[in-house]
Design a protein with these regions (language model features):
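Bacterial Sec-dependent N-terminal signal peptides
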Residues: 1-21
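Serine/threonine-rich low-complexity intrinsically disordered regions
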Residues: 1-2, 32, 103
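N-terminal, active-site-proximal structural segment of metallo-dependent hydrolase catalytic domains
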Residues: 16-78, 88-97
Length: 104
């Protein structure tokens, strides 16, 4: 019975009006001082990343290896987004985040 119900729900979903949702995930790479020495520091990557997100107009995007300062930079550059997530070390701001950003 449960399987039949699931099949009916899935079939009925195809009748509903579909809406496109643009979703992506991106490994930001943490803010590492050695990257800056090699010319690939966060200061160089942030504008490229935020321009890419703005250009593609993502509805939702996930990010990995995000330090708090990087999160703040992304939010400042992308005011049309908010996020859900916490730093993994203390459940607040310490450690890397894996935030999910969504359009406000």
């Amino acid at each position: 019975m449960r399987t039949l119900l699931i099949v009916l729900v899935l079939c009925s979903m195809s009748i509903l009006n579909a809406q496109q949702l643009n979703v992506v995930t991106y490994n930001v790479r943490n803010s590492n001082p050695n990257d800056a020495k090699a010319g690939n520091g966060w200061e160089q990557r942030c504008p490229v990343l935020t321009q890419l997100i703005t250009f593609h107009d993502f509805d939702i995007f996930g990010a990995q290896e995000v330090k708090h300062n990087q999160l703040e930079d992304m939010l400042n550059a992308l005011p049309q987004y908010s996020y859900i997530g916490v730093g993994r070390d203390d459940g607040k701001t310490k450690g890397e985040y894996a935030p999910i950003f969504y359009r406000k």
